[in-house]
Amino acid sequence: MTTYQRSFFCTAASAALFAAMAITSPVYAQSAPSAQLEVQKAASAQKQPLLESLKEFVNIETGSRDMEGILQATELLANKLRALGGQVQFIEPQESTAYRMMDTPEKIGRMVKATFTGTGTKRIMLIAHIDTVYPKGMAAKQPFRIDGDKAYGLGISDDKQGVAMVVHVVAMLKALNFNEFGTLTVLVNADEEISSPGSRAELTKAGGEHDAVLSFEATRTNSDKLSLATSGIASVELKVEGRASHAGAAPERGVNALYELSHQILQMRDLSQNDKGLKLNWTVSQAGTNRNVIPAYATAQADVRVLRVADYDGIEATVREKAKTQLLPDAKVIVKFERRRPPLEATPANRKLAAHAQTIYAELGRKLEVDDQPEGGGTDAAFAALKTQAAVVERFGLQGFGGHTADNEYILLDTVEARLYLAARVVMDISRGKGL
C-alpha cells in the first residue's frame, strides 16, 4: 500500500478522533461539512511527503543558467506528475517566441506541463518556477535542513516550495478521488528569475485557455496573504557613441560620450510619478577606459516599475522623446527599452476568487489577508493574466523568508497543512462553480 493509499484509509480510532475534533472545534462544529474534514486529513497526510519532495528539489541546484541541474530537476518533477496520472510534456523554448533581453543566456531552460482530465467543465491552472538566482556550487552552503519550525535550503522559498506545493495539491486531489474539474493543468518554468524570456509566451497563451490560475510564489512570514497585484518591471539601456581623443593634447577633437550620457541621465531624472506608482531610477553607468582618453563609449541602465500595462507605452515614449534632445550633436544616442515583466492588476475576477479563498481559510480558524497593491516585485502570474479576464491570484505558496539570500532562506513548517488545504479547497470549489 502506498503512502497516499494509507493516508486515504483511516482506522476506526482515527475516525473517532476526527469526529471528536469536529465536535470540540468551534470552527468545524459550527460550519464545516464532513467533506472539509476529509480535505484536512488529506492535507495532514501530505505534509511529510511534501517535505520529502522539497528536500529532493532543494538539493538539485537549478540556477537559471544551470542547464544540467534544470534538466535533472524537471525530469524529477515530470516523473512525480506522471505518477499522479498526468499527461506530461516538456516544452522547449522556441527562438521565434522568446523575448531576448540584454542578460538572456543563449540556452533557456525548458518547461514542464502536465494535464489532468476530469469529469467537469472548469479549466484550472497551477503555476510555479523551478529555477533560482544562485550560481552553481552554492548548495553546499545551504543544503536542505529542518531546524525547529523552519525548513532551510537554497531556493526553498523562491520557489522550490511552490513546485512541491503544486505536486502535493494534485496528490491530495488524487487521494480524495476528486476529479470534478474539466482540466487541471500544471505549468512549471525554469527561467522566471531571468524574466521568463522563453516561457512568457506559453504562460500567456495557457492563461487565456483557463478559467482560473493559481500561482504558488511564497507569501511572507509576517503576512499570511494572497496577492492580486504585482509590479511591472522594465529596464532602459542608454548607449552613447562618441569619439575618442587625447584628453590632454587634443580634447576638442573628441566627442565626450560621458558628457552626453550625463546630460541624458539628468534630463530623465524626474520621470517618476509616484502617485501613479510609476518609477524610473538610473542605477548603473559605465564610461571610459583611461584617465587621459576622452571616452568614446558610455552606457547607463535604469530600473522601471509600473502598476498598469498601459503605463509602459507612455514611459517608453517619453524616454525616447527626451533622448532626442542632445548636448553634443555629434554623439549617437541609442535607447533600448525592455519590458521585462508586465504588472498583475487587481480585477473583479481575482478579487472575487480571493474573497472566496478567505472564507475557506476561515474554516481553519485562520485569517487570510488579501493585498491588492504591489510590493515592488514581479511574478509570472502577470504573464498568465496578460490576455485573459479570468481570475489570476498570486501567493498560494507557503510562508517563507530570505528569497535570493544564500544563507538564510526558509519556509515555516506550520503553514504546510493550512496552505495545502487552502489550495486544494479552492481548486475543488472552482471545479464546482464556486468563487468565480
PLM regions and their residue ranges:
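Bacterial N-terminal signal peptides that target proteins for export
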Residues: 2-15
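C-terminal segment of classical bacterial N-terminal signal peptides
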Residues: 9, 18-28
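Metal-dependent amide/peptide-bond hydrolase catalytic core
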Residues: 30-36, 62, 79-85, 218-219, ...
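Acidic/His- and Gly-rich active-site-bordering loop/insert found
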Residues: 32-154, 175-176, 180
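Short glycine-aspartate micro-motif
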Residues: 123-125, 151, 211-215, 237, ...
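Acidic-glycine-rich active-site phosphate/pyrophosphate-binding loop
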Residues: 131-147, 214, 227-239, 359
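Short pre-catalytic strand/loop immediately N-terminal to key active-site residues, enriched for Gly-Thr
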Residues: 148-158, 368-371, 406-407
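Acidic/histidine-rich catalytic neighborhood of metal-dependent amide-processing enzymes
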Residues: 152-233, 273, 435-436
